[in-house]
Amino acid sequence: MQAEQEIVVLSNGPGELATWVYPYVTTLRQRVGSRVRISVVMVPCPHASGHEAEIARRYPVDRVLPVREFWRLLITKTTASGWDWLPRGAVVFLGGDQLFAVLLAKRLGYRCLLYCEWQARWHRWVDVIALRRPQPVPPTRAKVAVIGDLMTDVQTLAPEAQPDLRQMLGLAATTPLVALMAGSKPNKLKLGLPLSLAIADQLASATPPIPCVIPVAPTLTLESLSRYADPTDNPELTHIAGTTAQLYQPTDGLPYLETPQGTKVYLWQQLPNYPLLRQVAIAVTTVGANTAELAALNVPMVVLLPAQQLRVRRAHPWDGLAGLLVALPAIGRHWTALVFWVLVAKGLGWRRFWQVLQAPDIDWQLVKEGLGYKAWPNLWAGQEIVPELVGPLDPQAVAEQLIHYLDHPQELAAMKVALQAVVGSPGAAASLVELTLSELSVGKE
């Protein structure tokens, strides 16, 4: 059946693709089959990895436009691959700058829908505003609906794990698994992977040993990941109490990184990785979209913010001029440290911040208080429901905290309940699909 209508999904980064686009387009495809053509258009974003189009092509969509062609599309309505456009359609904003969705909808003559987690902008020029949670919206002609969190639908879309990782590794069904999620970008992996491997060493020496697995980000190959565990390729290993590892890719079984201590950290490449994450007892992760994905699956986690990154990290989650300056090679490292401490000072107040600076040893608990919450579930809840560890992190101390949780399953169960409460119930994707199809019907008039 030839499609008669077009749905153009705008997005910008791996996190938005995994937590917003994937549930939406999967639900949409199940609902409409081939009656509607689904196009994904990647928009400019300073935090994008450059591999977003490749990730989106794995989803049930008809075509994907990489970010390098976005401006040509917006200005000329054409693409290098000669895309055509159906007479009726809708542009659905699922990440990036909301203005891009407004402008592209005007250019194509389509309806415009915004999914808004925090704040709706350009409300006078859109047709539908779908809100994650109730929030004030200025008077507008747009239809406004509260639909919930798209990420909750990950729970229903994630199939049960087959095969079970424990079976593949010959482990007992009751063996707890720990997921190590060190990130997908160089600025996080340079320190995150060596630290994760050192944590795995500590867990392997526990009684009984606790196996670890790394869900490999879709933007990484095994070879590119392993380079961050090689001191020749990653000189930042000297900045953290991490360890090295060597990559092994056996013909039978999962590939793995092996540390000098002999610890094997298994590498999981199946995408989406939700079936694996459902198997783990707890995850160790950096800040970012990982915390939102884990929360959507109700997976307990410990979130790491290593202070060692102040000396080497150039890219970070803050937007604006500071984000651009941090990316400059000449001043990046010093500016990152400056921005970090300014944020701490802003959160604590200058008087308390001055006390932190004057103390012989840094009070990292105060620093953490000044930074505020960084993990998404904590931001949503307004309180710490998953632990955030800030400071010059010690792999042994992190491992001990993980072992504590594994030895106290009631605490893990309570964390799961808290995550489920803050994320909410599934159904947002279906609601957004119905809003979209309703607008397509309006477009027929």
Range-by-range predicted roles:
Residues M1-E445:
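Nucleotide-activated sugar donor-binding and catalytic core shared by glycosyltransferases
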